[in-house]
Amino acid sequence: MKANDIKKGNVVEYNNGVYQIRDIERSSPQGRGGNVRFRFIMYSVPGGNKLDASFDADDNLVEVELLRRQSTYSYKDGDAFVFLDDEDYTPYTLDADVIGDDAGYITDGLTGIYVQVIDEQPVAIQLPASVVLEVIETPPELKGGTATKRPKPAKLNTGIEIMVPEYIVNGERVLVNTATGEFAGRAD
């Protein structure tokens, strides 16, 4: 698979190890003939050791076959998150450092999560495209400010903060895009 086809969450072989891509930076320098370069932040699977590597768009990486098991978030065990397989109720336990920033989107009973499994070991999760979270703290709407679309900060029930439109109030349930971390509309 070419470097320019790789997406966040893919698992690849590199330097005799297996790594999951967590972040991708694309740069197109003006010199050097304008070759597009990709910088991947990867974590070893299993182990979670961070690796930073750069590739040209045409560089080939071998994608690793992994199982994707649809699961539901069950509970937190210390720093670990426990997910139950939707079909056979197999528990998958992943440490908080493996979950990373995705922890801010995980609520009790969240469904539609895919646990990625290699050699019967859970290595990562893939969240649904959007999740419903509750606004617990946001400033009130400014009266007379309806002509402008000013976003305002809102703290959500999982502890993350996003920008929301002015008409959103405390206690309201909102959709949040898990890929961008942005407000995606009202829930319900």
From Swiss-Prot:
Pfam families: EFP, EFP_N, Elong-fact-P_C. Disulfide bonds: none annotated. CDD domains: S1_EF-P_repeat_1, S1_EF-P_repeat_2. GO terms for biological process: peptide biosynthetic process. One of its GO terms (molecular function) is translation elongation factor activity. Belongs to the elongation factor P family. This is Elongation factor P-like protein. It comes from Stenotrophomonas maltophilia (strain K279a).
